[in-house]
Amino acid sequence: DRYVESTRAIMQENAVYPNMLALAERAWLGGGAGYFNAPTAALSPEASAETREAFVDFERRLLWHNDRVFAGEPFPYVAQSHAQWYISPVYPNGGDLTASYLPEEQYLKQMKAHQYTPPAEVGGEAYPYQRTSGGSGVYLRHTWGDICYGLVPNASENSTVYATAWVHSDADTTAGLIFETQNYSRSEADVAPQQGTWDYKGSRLWVNGEAIAPPRWLNAVGQRNIDLPLANENAASRPPLQIQLQKGWNQILIKLPIGRFTLPEIRLNKWMFAAAITTPDGGKALPNLQYAKPSL
């Protein structure tokens, strides 16, 4: 496994305390909503109302322990059960990771016209989305393919998908955004992204039509090196982005192309995203934030 510089880095990168409590919950109570390849997990589109309610209760108790038991300890988890993302159809990109498709074109046109209010329903040409996902972290295709559940069935290489969310803020505010499109495995020697890019897939991010730049990567691009510790490649190990939310509705768009599932720089090229809107310091989910839930 990859060299690490401190015990704290291990706890932070691997979310040890949140995962420990999640494992304890299931080991103590049993139950659950399907095996790990089932599309019925707590925040997936096919989850039952009872499963979702159970997760909301679990999350409440998880965060209670964060505040009272693990204060000051690395605990990379914020509330996400209220989040709602809309996912576009899959667009074959023929290997062109820069190609634009209808969701991007319509979004930029709507943002230029200041059309921030969510529609009553999605699925048409103006809002071409066909599935939803709750939560702030979504695997379109799991690292291990069909062995584990991913949102896009029968995912294939050279594909592009978009994810969008509408969020309502009570006031103009600066918020944090915990964001990543590649979670670097701690058992791999994968190479940091090139400066000015989010990953090796061509992912992009917009908030109200403004393109959001990636951070400056601390590890320089180079050869794969198992003895080089991860720096700020993963969102858990860097400050959140600072984004501006306007009073009223805001729309976020994430472009998620994928080329090959394995690259010279990244052995496990993960088709995924994490996007959690937080307080500016990233410590908690932003209070009083409302996600729109148009019908499909």
Residue ranges and their predicted role:
Residues 1-82:
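Flexible, acidic glycine-rich loops studded with aromatic residues
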Residues 157-161, 168-178:
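Extended extracellular/luminal ectodomain segments enriched in beta-structured repeat modules
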Residues 165-171, 181-185, 258-260:
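Beta-strand elements of well-folded, non-transmembrane domains
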Residues 57-156, 186, 217, 255-296:
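Accessory carbohydrate-binding/adhesion or oligomerization-edge regions at the termini
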